[in-house]
UniProtKB/Swiss-Prot annotation:
The gene is ushA. The lineage of its organism: Bacteria, Pseudomonadati, Pseudomonadota, Gammaproteobacteria, Enterobacterales. The keyword Transmembrane helix does not apply. This is Protein UshA. It comes from Escherichia coli (strain K12). Its cofactor is Zn(2+). Monomer.
Length: 550
């Protein structure tokens, strides 16, 4: 039985031709079939979710089936990841993503781009992950400041049939801004597009590959409109010589890159429907959403130095939709035929899953309503989850008010029982709660700067015990705990070491005399607060329009 139906087919022809002369190892007038499979933004999802969706066991079955199909047609497969293996699922986070990397080995990944979340841990952890991985972790634009040398392999070379394929890795230069500054004291992220130009030239002069692909973790922004984010794949493709890459396998923005029109993605892509990838400057750009929800499949034909895409599809990995029947009952129904889980993978990952679950499933409290932590809320508006987290930090530190990046809130908690797993999904980064004692004047300056952080970015701030009206770069009617700020008074503010050391572009506090690092991990602080405050009444934490922008 064939696992796949063809997706977007022959209408998607494009041509990739190397600008330089290559040492021809391929046969003239022979057509070579190359299939590039890709995922990105895995974020710890080695195991299926509670609805039986995605997971590496089903992914392996899918990939194995494609490999068999392609081999039967005389073709070859390359499997790439756009990065961010780390951070998002507690069972993975507590084990430094060891199950994820070992599972990726079994699936048969060939290479991955290093993502910004690979730096959520110290570099020593990433070096251990490199040892677990039987495939290269690539980034051409990450350098050690003190030596000026690259920290990782910039590219990897693969032989498929008679073809030499080069894969370049590139990482968003936002990493130093959105990651933990304490981990970047000797690390520099150079402009990816500039490094890509250099690496392509070097490859063409030295290795002379037949095909060059970029595996990136930079983000896809329609028409290159990246806002406060660093430039992404579209901008890079436009900056490179036309057709200098066959394709960009992307990540970071966590989108299904399926175009509705030129320079405009589909807003609500439906799993299992046709997907046309983006094309900029003769370069295909693909991205497979997140978490292993899809495996992207790009089928190419290479003939006489020309690379043509003949088919593209996003293949759902057991994704389901919620259906409500006439009797009011609902269930989750597969979009596409079920993919069986590979039992060898289940055997490999079960011990990791069981070890993690044992630590995480114990009830720590309960809530009478939903605590809102979804990405499309915490980066745009104040939420009750933000208030709860900051209440916990104020409680631990005795602070008058608290601030943090909305991007540090990673999940919601539904009404009902709360486990430590729920808490760790909300705050997976292991940041430390800190506080700073500041004069009222310093508070005014700090909050004025933070209030300029724009919505639709991880930097958008969540506030507690703060009220103001922001207009024209100034704060009007600024109050702490309902009282006007006294410039001569001393106030204590709680936040995370991430923000206090300049993360997300926030003003630095760690060099101030009144700065204290408590040593308490954020998730542990939230857990303890929930335990002592349970059952939680969500109305207590509901924002009431205290902060506004005009």
């Amino acid at each position: 039985m064939k696992l796949l139906q063809r997706g977007v087919a022959l209408a998607l022809l494009t041509t990739f031709t190397l600008a330089s002369e290559t040492a021809l190892a391929y046969e003239q007038d022979k057509t070579y079939k190359i299939t590039v499979l890709h995922t990105n933004d895995h974020h710890g999802h080695f195991w299926r979710n509670e609805y039986g969706e995605y997971g590496l066991a089903a992914q392996k079955t899918l990939v194995d089936g494609i490999r068999k199909e392609v081999a039967a047609e005389g073709g070859s497969v390359l499997l790439l990841s756009g990065g961010d293996i780390n951070t998002g699922v507690p069972e993975s986070d507590l084990q430094d993503a060891e199950p994820d990397f070992r599972g990726m080995n079994l699936v048969g990944y060939d290479a991955m781009a290093i993502g910004n979340h690979e730096f959520d841990n110290p570099l020593t952890v990433l070096r251990q992950q490199e040892k677990w991985a039987k495939f290269p972790l690539l980034s051409a634009n990450i350098y050690q400041k003190s030596t000026g040398e690259r920290l990782f392999k910039p590219w990897a070379l693969f032989k498929r049939q008679d073809l030499k394929i080069a894969v370049i890795g590139l990482t968003t230069d936002d990493t130093a801004k959105i990651g933990n500054p304490e981990y970047f004291t000797d690390i520099e992220f150079r402009k990816p597009a500039d490094e890509a130009k250099l690496v392509i030239q070097e490859l063409q002069q030295t290795e002379k590959p037949d095909i060059i692909i970029a595996a990136t973790h930079m983000g896809h922004y329609d028409n290159g409109e990246h806002g406060s984010n660093a430039p992404g794949d579209v901008e890079m493709a436009r900056a490179l010589p036309a057709g200098s890459l066959a394709m960009i396998v992307g990540g970071h923005s966590q989108d299904p890159v399926c175009m509705a029109a030129e320079n405009k993605k589909q807003v609500d892509y439906v799993p299992g429907t046709p997907c046309k990838p983006d094309q900029q400057n003769g370069i295909w750009i693909v991205q497979a959403h997140e978490w292993g929800k899809y495996v992207g499949r790009a089928d190419f034909e290479f003939r006489n130095g020309e690379m043509k895409m003949v088919n593209y599809q996003l293949i759902p990995v057991n994704l389901k939709k919620k259906v409500t029947w006439e009797d009011g009952k609902s269930e989750r129904v597969l979009y596409t035929p079920e993919i069986a889980e590979n039992q060898q993978m289940i055997s490999l990952l079960s011990p990791f899953q069981n070890k993690g679950k044992a630590q995480l499933e114990v009830k720590i409290g309960e809530t009478n309503g939903r605590l809102e932590g979804d990405r499309d809320k915490v980066r745009f508006v104040q939420t009750n989850m933000g208030r709860l987290i900051l209440a916990a930090q104020m409680d631990r530190t005795g602070a008058d008010f608290a601030v943090m990046s909305g991007g540090g809130i990673r999940d919601s908690i539904e009404a009902g029982d709360i486990s430590y797993k729920n808490v760790l999904k909300v705050q997976p980064f292991g940041n430390v709660v800190v506080y700073a004692d500041m004069t009222g004047k310093e508070v005014i300056d700090y909050l004025t700067a933070v209030a300029q952080m724009k919505p639709d970015s991880g930097a958008y701030p969540q506030f507690a015990n703060v009220s103001f009206v922001a207009k024209d770069g100034k704060l009007n009617d600024l109050k702490i705990k309902g009282e006007p700020v006294d410039p001569a008074k001393t106030y204590r503010m709680a936040t995370l070491n991430f923000n206090a050391t300049g993360g997300d572009g926030y003003p630095r506090l760690d060099n101030k005399p009144g700065y204290v690092n408590t040593g308490f991990i954020d998730a542990e602080v939230l857990k303890a607060y929930i335990q002592k405050s349970s059952p939680l009444d969500v109305s207590v934490y509901e924002p009431k329009g205290e902060v506004s922008w005009q």
